[in-house]
């Protein structure tokens, strides 16, 4: 019972205390967070969340903990490790680093790590221990060991040299630190080694052989040489090719060089290189600063040799002879060096009599060359008179004399070109007219590309391309003949000099000979008879009339085709028959100017322009329009210009009547048929057959290039029987196939890897050739067999 009352009294006391106690207010966790965020937003409170979000920490506390962690870790800590220890975002760590570095000058940020001076002092002590042990340490090795940048380490260690580190850094190579004992030991080794050297030695070989530190060796060697302790020089600087040359060797070198130059008057660069002088030119310039020298490609010569050559050249010029300087020079000098020396010498004679240099070493005076030319004068007159008696020749103008000096060679015209022109004249007029007469001489010239008429149609399929012979050239003597002649008159001359002199004289001799020929032939042609000129005019009028009527009939045949085909046919007609008739008229006028040629087909656009420049103004206007009409696209315009030109030149053109037209048609057909009978070329067979079938079908002549044959065959589709047209188309396909096969074979050349392909193509070509041979007679029969009796159908 007593216990119960005791419990009651205790509860009453607790109740009384609760009644009189003051009330305590508590905030929830959520309310606390909202209040803190509000204060942070109003910038009344500056705190940072921890990464787990359970705590707030002030920036000052972050800085304090960073300093503590830096101290705990010995003065070097990574900021990533700080972030893990302090448990805040990395950006807050980085923000505080700047404040720490500003406030504490002994702390630095290096590659994301905080480092203080205490750490660097301990690092310097470790480096000093390594240095005293090995005698040298390299910054590169320390970078790998301590994982720090080289520039930072170099700066930090340099500040502690003499204070913590007992050593010094190489001023030329700040990547190595040495001890005084190490430097002294190496200096003694270097001094002893280089004192024993008596010939040029590569420094690099000594470094590898004796294990020297490269930069230290160069520094010590430079110091010893500059102080005079080592007598010698380092050639090539601090490079792999640096060479140490001892003074004793240099003195021996210099003695030999001076002696050789004094005795011979020249120095070879190769000889100096064999003596161990790497840069011979610089050595010579340095050695002979005040001596006048001439530097060549492989040697240098003194003024004595130059004066000797100059005197010989001067004597040759004054006496009007020649001199070869090669015997005057040392045999070791190359021809190239001799030529350079001669060029230098010749500058002194630039204002005196002109000279010519042959074979790089032979100087020939202008008087000697003129004397050589005069040796041929009598021979020229004899040959010119002989030519006058034996052969009729071209009359040569002053322009031709100028041209012959620039055109070294022009090719002789091919035989088929002349045959082509004769064939076209036969097709057009029915008459065979040769150019120049039976005794006309053809003067051959070497090849030169001719610019004129570059737009001529090329019709390889029909072999009817319109080309002309090259302009001939009168030649006096060939080079070997000139050489033989000179050998008889020039004694003791080198063969190479004779050959080059002959080559040099060819052009002036030919030019002089042309003048002699012209003067001789002019005197023999001044009495040309008027009867001969009348005969020439009559022949010209007949040929012009024939070609004029041909053009009219060809124009009529072109009108059966579409516009694009007509354009191609018109262009071909202008470049061929129209050009022929134009050249006939121009050549007729050129005869009065002494500019005529044997074959008018050889006249190019440039020659026509030259002839125009010599004509009177009245004739020039009409002929210029005729010349320009060849480049137009209208036959009517050409005919109009031709009428005006014929009237201006007093050439009477006979227009053909119906009877004359029938004769021309018959002669043209007969000429084509005769050519078809004898030819075996499939492309030409197809071309001639197509043109003849066209004439049979339309009673009109056609002058077409090979590339228009497909259009002619297409036109004949409705004009000839279907089986004949099918045969013609089949033959056309075989011809095209053969041409393509030939083109591929030409393009491939001779390659061993193409043997199988070549064999296959050869089989195809053989089959095509056989089929063409079988069909050729059938194709010819289309116009020959069935038309034999149709002689008078026109």
From Swiss-Prot:
Result when mutating residue 536 to E: Mimics phosphorylation; leading to decreased PDCD1/PD-1 ufmylation
Entry PTM: Ubiquitinated, leading to its degradation by the proteasome. Interaction with CDK5RAP3 protects both proteins against ubiquitination and degradation via the proteasome.
Region (Mediates interaction with CDK5RAP3): 490-684
Residue numbers spanned by region Disordered: 407-473, 745-770
Residues recorded as bearing Phosphothreonine in the entry: 536
Subcellular location: Endoplasmic reticulum membrane; Cytoplasm, Cytosol; Nucleus; Chromosome
BP term (GO), one: negative regulation of IRE1-mediated unfolded protein response
Main location: endoplasmic reticulum
Effect of residue 15 to R: Abolished interaction with E2-like enzyme UFC1
Keywords, ordered alphabetically: Acetylation, Chromosome, Cytoplasm, DNA damage, DNA repair, Endoplasmic reticulum, Membrane, Methylation, Nucleus, Phosphoprotein, Transferase, Ubl conjugation, Ubl conjugation pathway
Location of the region described as Required for E3 UFM1-protein ligase activity in the Swiss-Prot/TrEMBL record: 2-212
Record-listed Omega-N-methylarginine modification sites: 433
Biological function: E3 protein ligase that mediates ufmylation, the covalent attachment of the ubiquitin-like modifier UFM1 to lysine residues on target proteins, and which plays a key role in various processes, such as ribosome recycling, response to DNA damage, interferon response or reticulophagy (also called ER-phagy). Catalyzes ufmylation of many protein, such as CD274/PD-L1, CDK5RAP3, CYB5R3, DDRGK1, EIF6, histone H4, MRE11, P4HB, PDCD1/PD-1, TRIP4, RPN1, RPS20/uS10, RPL10/uL16, RPL26/uL24, SYVN1/HRD1 and TP53/p53.
Protein name, as recorded: E3 UFM1-protein ligase 1
Species for this entry: Homo sapiens (Human)
Source taxonomy: Eukaryota, Metazoa, Chordata, Craniata, Vertebrata
Name of the gene encoding the protein in the UniProt record: UFL1
